[in-house]
């Protein structure tokens, strides 16, 4: 329980800082089996774009949806959808997770395909 609570406290602290920037944020969440990404508006009221390993187009390309390759595909897809809506500059909200492994892979993939953060 302490590990989860610490992550939630880190996430809350990060979101507080990001809200002061008043730009869209890329929120990333991961479970043992899936990776989720959403771009949320600066006033925190609307989801502007989303992608996850639950989508058939992504899950069909990989054998297991909880790995780095799947996170790379989610990063690519979220970047494409953001650029379609003319969103180029965002803040990266890792939801208290370490910038390592799948989270890092998703972020680098989103940067590679055109998002700036």
UniProtKB/Swiss-Prot annotation:
Record-linked InterPro entries: Ribosomal_uL18_bac-type (IPR004389), Ribosomal_uL18_bac/euk (IPR005484)
Pfam families, sorted: Ribosomal_L18p
Keyword Ribosomal protein among record annotations: yes
UniProt GO BP: translation
Record's keyword terms, sorted: Ribonucleoprotein, Ribosomal protein, RNA-binding, rRNA-binding
GO CC terms, sorted: cytosolic large ribosomal subunit
Domain of life: Bacteria
CDD domains (alphabetical): Ribosomal_L18_L5e (cd00432)
Gene Ontology molecular functions: 5S rRNA binding; structural constituent of ribosome
Family from the record: Belongs to the universal ribosomal protein uL18 family.
Record-linked HAMAP family: Ribosomal_uL18_B (MF_01337_B)
NCBIfam families: L18_bact (TIGR00060)
Role: This is one of the proteins that bind and probably mediate the attachment of the 5S RNA into the large ribosomal subunit, where it forms part of the central protuberance.
Quaternary context: Part of the 50S ribosomal subunit; part of the 5S rRNA/L5/L18/L25 subcomplex. Contacts the 5S and 23S rRNAs.
Protein name as catalogued: Large ribosomal subunit protein uL18
Species assigned in the record: Wigglesworthia glossinidia brevipalpis
């Amino acid at each position: 329980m302490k590990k989860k609570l610490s992550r939630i406290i880190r996430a809350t602290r990060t979101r507080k800082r990001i809200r002061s920037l008043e730009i869209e944020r890329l929120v990333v969440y991961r479970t043992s089996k899936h990776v989720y990404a959403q771009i949320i508006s600066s006033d925190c009221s609307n989801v502007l774009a989303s992608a996850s390993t639950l989508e058939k187009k992504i899950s069909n390309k990989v054998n297991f949806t909880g790995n780095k390759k799947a996170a790379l595909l989610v990063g690519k897809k979220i970047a494409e959808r953001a650029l379609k809506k003319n969103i180029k500059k965002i803040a990266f909200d890792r939801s208290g997770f370490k910038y390592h492994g799948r989270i890092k892979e998703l972020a680098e993939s989103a940067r590679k395909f055109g998002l700036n953060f």
